[in-house]
Amino acid sequence: MARPFAFLMVLVVISYWSTCSLGCDLPQTHNLRNKKILTLLAQMRRLSPLSCLKDRKDFGFPQEKVDAQQIQEAQAIPVLSELTQQILTLFTSKDSSAAWNATLLDSFCTGLHQLLNDLQGCLMQLVGMKELPLTQEDSQLAMKKYFHRITVYLREKKHSPCAWEVVRAEVWRALSSSVNLLARLSEEKE
């Protein structure tokens, strides 16, 4: 009788530990995918940023929502998922396809889709474990507003090559922030 009871206790402890730990396990390849996406986005550049200085704009990236020093994993994953989804939506629009090399754009969007799948799997783990913080909704709304400003800008500029170059550079900065955040979260787990 003692052995089945001990076995049941081990199962309960393992179950409790796996559901109460804050972390979620992103695949080892996630950081590599992030870096590859940044490389692809850099390769997509068609114009010198200097030739588009007149078109530059501050879109108000919500840096505090991805600040590696202030955010916890339970807050970070939903924000990073929203960021990735918004970038994917932006670059899969019909107006986007005319602006970029088709092969690079396809590879970039495929990589984003893989990242999004990783993040959404992680998000499902977090949702299953506990209630997510209320600040998550504020953070996701901040990301949506940020990308709305980008979309309006592109429309106002009639999706000009310079407008897309400004947006490409802006998205590169946003993705770089997300890579830094994920790196910090990975370090904390070790």
UniProtKB/Swiss-Prot annotation:
- Coiled coil: which residue ranges? none
Q: Where is the signal peptide?
A: 1-23
Q: Which of UniProt's keywords are assigned here?
A: Antiviral defense, Cytokine, Disulfide bond, Glycoprotein, Secreted, Signal
MF terms in GO: cytokine activity; cytokine receptor binding
**Which parts pass through the membrane?**
none
Q: What does this protein do?
A: Produced by macrophages, IFN-alpha have antiviral activities. Interferon stimulates the production of two enzymes: a protein kinase and an oligoadenylate synthetase.
What is the protein name stated in its UniProt record? Answer: Interferon alpha-9
The species this protein was found in: Mus musculus
